[in-house]
Regions:
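Short aromatic-glycine-enriched beta-strand elements
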Residues: 18-34, 86
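Hydrophobic alpha-helical segments of small multi-pass membrane proteins
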Residues: 44, 48-50, 87-94
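Short, Lys/Arg- and Gly-enriched loop/turn segments at beta-strand edges
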Residues: 75-80
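A beta-strand/beta-hairpin structural motif
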Residues: 35-59
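OB-fold and OB-like beta-barrel modules that bind single-stranded nucleic acids
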Residues: 6-14, 31, 62-74, 92-95
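Acidic, gly/ser/pro-rich intrinsically disordered tails
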Residues: 1-4, 16-23, 39, 83, ...
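Short coil/loop residues immediately preceding or within conserved phosphate-binding loops
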Residues: 3, 7, 26-28, 41-43, ...
Length: 119
């Protein structure tokens, strides 16, 4: 059996909200993450779907500090030039917006319906 669970914390550097053709809400985030002070910023893409996306659209703003829990996913496609492309991202199951003015305490943890069923 294999294990696929990711927990990451970072600052939101980009946020895009859209609806799919069948009216599902999707929130795409890019988090800026640093391991240490003098290490370059790593950009990590995070995707929120459905009810989690609805909550994320309301609660998450650019420059918010988040803790995200989810699974690592990979998109694969062929571009116009015929080259195979891949992209890794985190499909979020939970997130918590941290209030840095209160010492990094979280407001509340928001989780997907699938995550609630597993508990």
């Amino acid at each position: 059996m294999f294990f696929n669970r990711v927990i990451i914390a970072g600052r939101v550097i980009a946020k895009e909200t859209r609806q799919t053709s069948n009216n599902n809400l999707v929130v795409n985030l890019r988090l800026g993450v640093k391991e240490e002070k003098n290490v370059p910023l790593t950009h990590v893409d995070v995707v929120l779907w459905g009810k989690l996306a609805e909550q994320g659209d309301k609660k998450i703003e650019k420059d918010s500090v988040l803790v995200v829990e989810g699974v690592l996913r990979q998109d694969r496609w062929v571009n116009k030039e015929g080259e195979k492309r891949t992209k890794l991202y985190i499909k979020a199951n939970k997130f918590c917006v941290l209030d840095m003015n209160r010492g990094g305490q979280g407001e509340e943890t928001v989780e997907s319906e699938e995550e609630k069923k597993e508990e």
